[in-house]
Design a protein with these regions (language model features):
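A basic, amphipathic helix-loop patch mediating RNA/tRNA/ribosome contacts
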Residues: 22-54
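S4-like RNA-binding module at protein N-termini
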Residues: 56-87
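NAD(P)H dinucleotide-binding glycine-rich loop of Rossmann-like/cofactor-binding domains
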Residues: 81-107
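C-terminal structural segment of proteins
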Residues: 10, 15, 55-59, 68-71, ...
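Flanking scaffold residues of small Cys/His-coordinated metal-binding clusters
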Residues: 4, 39, 44, 64-67, ...
Length: 486
């Protein structure tokens, strides 16, 4: 396989080629320290505050797409073939303010100003996609941006007023779209990228077959897709992650499509890209999906990464377990498929051998008479980690429960099915008493721990109450449902 020792990308429309790139180098440090583009700020360095928000454009199926991402945890090596847009790009001739900036000024959306560039870039990304967004769409776009002083009301008013100052059709990104597309296409040479800096190494395989070969050659490599977790290993724990194999550029892993009886999801599909199809097939997931992290993280993080990470409090594994998903693992040319729940062996341990990687996820399409719900319990509504996550998939025919798949996160060392609760439901009448009895069976399935997110008692009580909530939502009996109280 032919390789090259450098990454090539565009920065605010300028061609960049770098060969001195370490596996742990971040986009934020490059912008601020190497390019002196200091409009992009460092706040949290963990993808929570949004002060470092930039846009990254990439060709996908030949089409150029821009997304808001967190520069603080976006690793430089992953930018090969991309167009990075920082807040400095928005400046017009003679310092003229961009429509997003002008709206923020006129509606007093900035006070200390530290968070303002990040808000500007998130609103810019939204405005380019939806020039006349609803308030819900604005709030969704700003989930990953925190302001400590001004408050959000003037920022939301500014977001609604952007079109008073200009149209996306007249924006530089729109006017230069064809040129940028052509230039990014010219960067696609089908070669493996192999970067070395001091003792650090980062590899971008040419395709999934090359990925399989690279992992056979370097089975101890850290695999990185969205870097929403690994990025914190770098910024918070100062961990040496080299050698790194990057996955987010591989189009084969970023495909999601409906097939006859299932949804095919490549392991590199982001939360944002999965949302359209998964939430269309399973409408109950829309509210749940909106609770996963913030907009920037959903644009970066991948479904496969959330599974492979193996966290007991990951958001998507309980949902996928309840839906009966299967995953395909690949090592070299060999593949094996297993139910997703069998992948999670113990805390920090997954059924994955050296040199093997998660390639695809297979989610069955909804069956008749199935009732679905998914719930996330956390201290904050937006951009928080789950205390408890639960997903229900129950089939009812003629008033009798025919099958049940119920899974929880935050209740054990791994995402796990509630086998005793499932067994208690099957064959029973669809009634609150049946759900209450099944909830009591949770004590046979789980012995939750106490940590700073929640106590063991709280976790068990809220999990039992989710059975009652599930029944209420699917029976219209909300006023009569009795909740467990400690």
């Amino acid at each position: 396989m032919h390789s090259r020792p450098n990454i090539r990308f565009l920065l605010n429309g300028r061609d960049i080629s770098l060969d001195d790139v370490g596996a742990s180098d971040t986009l934020l440090d490059y912008l601020r320290l190497e390019r002196r583009l200091t409009g992009t700020k460092e706040g949290c360095a963990e993808g929570d505050c949004g002060a470092c928000t930039v846009l990254v454009g990439r060709l996908q199926d030949g089409s150029l797409r821009y997304e808001a991402v967190n520069a603080c945890i976006r690793l430089m090596a992953s930018l090969d073939g991309c167009h990075v847009v920082s807040v400095e790009y928005l400046s017009g001739p003679h310092g003229k303010l961009h429509p997003v900036q002008q709206a923020m000024v006129e509606h007093h959306g900035s006070q200390c100003g530290f968070c303002t560039p990040g808000f500007i870039m998130s609103l810019y990304a939204l405005w380019m996609q939806k020039p006349d967004p609803s308030e819900d769409e604005i709030e969704t776009a700003l989930q990953g941006n925190l302001c400590r002083c001004t408050g959000y009301a003037p920022i939301i008013r500014a977001a609604k007023a952007i079109t008073e100052h200009g149209s996306p059709a007249e924006d530089a990104l729109t006017m230069e779209r064809d040129d940028i597309t052509t230039r990014l296409s010219a960067l696609q040479d089908g070669k493996r990228v192999d970067l070395r800096k001091d003792n650090s190494r980062a590899i971008l395989p040419a395709n999934t077959d090359d990925l399989a070969q690279v992992l056979l050659e370097t089975p101890d490599a850290t695999m990185v897709a969205g870097a929403t977790d690994v990025g914190l290993w770098v910024t918070k724990f100062l961990k040496d992650i080299s050698p790194v194999v990057f996955l987010n550029h591989l189009e084969e892993l970023r495909k999601i499509e409906r097939r006859d009886d299932h949804i095919h999801i490549g392991a590199g599909v982001s939360y944002s890209d999965a949302e359209a199809i998964l939430c269309d097939e399973y409408p109950h997931l829309r509210a749940f999906w909106d609770r996963i992290a913030g907009w920037q993280i959903r644009n970066m993080g991948t479904i496969g990464g959330n599974i492979a990470n193996g966290s007991p409090i990951g958001d998507t594994p309980p949902v996928l377990i309840a839906l009966g998903a299967e995953i395909t693992l690949r090592r070299g040319d060999a593949r094996r498929t297993l139910p997703i729940e069998d992948f999670f062996v113990d805390y920090g341990k997954q059924d994955l051998v050296p040199g093997e990687f998660l390639e695809t996820i297979r989610v069955p399409r909804p069956g008749p008479d199935a009732r679905h719900s998914a719930y996330k319990i956390s201290k904050r509504r937006d951009e928080d980690i789950s205390s408890v996550c639960a997903a229900f998939n129950v089939t009812v025919q003629n008033g009798t429960i025919q099958s049940a798949r119920i899974a929880f996160g935050g209740m054990a060392a791994t995402p796990k099915r509630a086998a005793s609760a499932e067994q208690a439901l099957v064959g029973q009448t669809w009634a609150e008493a049946s759900l209450t009895a099944a909830a009591e069976a949770l004590a046979q399935d789980f012995s939750p721990l106490t940590d700073w997110r929640a106590s063991a008692v709280y976790r068990m009580q809220v999990s039992k109450n989710l059975f009652r909530r599930f029944y209420a939502e699917h029976s219209g009996a909300t006023s009569d449902v009795q909740l467990v109280r400690g």
